[in-house]
């Protein structure tokens, strides 16, 4: 926007995989495809979820929790969506948007060393698939 309006340089904006956040309590952050969108686009979709109470909530006595979900095209192993509800969701999804935009794979996430103790470490330690959707060949 700034380059186009103030720098007088037209910039083509890529509207795919733009992160979005809702600054409610708890925050909601999302980037990429939803499960439904991925299922419509890909033959096999894997979903990884983590629901937990972050350490800072535990230490402070807060009951707040975080839900994270990765949506993966199983055919390419590419992470095509990430959805987070909880503290710092906007900050987390902004960074994950880089990985989604770069077409990072679930294996890339798995190979990333986790920074402990953070909520973000859940994104690279989700090893157990929680759902797999296989499109009916007749559909």
Each model region followed by its residue ranges:
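Flexible, glycine-rich terminal cap/loop adjacent to redox cofactors
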Residues: 3-11, 23-139
